[in-house]
Amino acid sequence: MNHAFSFMLAAALLAPATTLAQDTTTSAQVKRGEYLVTTGLCHDCHTPLIQGPDGPAPDMKRALSGHPQEIVVKAPAIVPEPWTGAMSPTLTTWSGPWGVSFTANLTPDPETGVLRDFTEQQFIQTMRTGRHQGQGRRILPPMPWPWIGKMTDDDLKAVFAYLRQIPAVKNKVPDPIPPK
């Protein structure tokens, strides 16, 4: 058997094993991301609540799609002293001294998903700096980016990998409303 044939045979036999190892790593990374998103309570704000027979429940058909585009908010809520903020019944709109913030659509929808143009590194920078794509406008309350930003690079990469593969939900979240 000549060396060229031996090399090609070895490469052909090893390629599926390499691909399998990569798929396993990716699958493990996505599972880790799902675990972190779930236990990190991302659904609490990024998945709208709907009223059911037992009270509010997450609308999993809209999982992680942010503030529903059909619910229009035009101005910050006015709250009496000593309160400083208010939230919508869907838990996707928050109003306070910063104005009104709407939870982002974290799904990979190519038109409306906030992460559609992010690289993995930009996602990590966003979580570490509190700025969109690591350099844009600041992320508004109640997003707990200072704590999420303390996650390891591997954990943030896992979260990003998970968010990139969840079902896309077309939902255009409005821009924040500045304070009056």
PLM regions and their residue ranges:
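Positively charged n-region of N-terminal signal peptides that target proteins for export
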Residues: 1-5
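Bacterial N-terminal signal peptides
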Residues: 6-16
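Electrostatic cytochrome c docking/interface patches
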Residues: 19-38, 50-56, 111-112
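The canonical Cys-X-X-Cys-His
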Residues: 33, 39-49, 159, 163
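Residues that flank catalytic or metal-binding motifs in active/ligand-binding sites
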Residues: 38, 102, 139
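N-terminal, post-signal-peptide region of Sec/Tat-exported proteins
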Residues: 43-72
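Electron-transfer interface patches adjacent to heme c in soluble/periplasmic c-type cytochromes
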Residues: 62-122, 146-156
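C-terminal capping alpha-helices of c-type cytochrome domains
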Residues: 117-133, 145-174
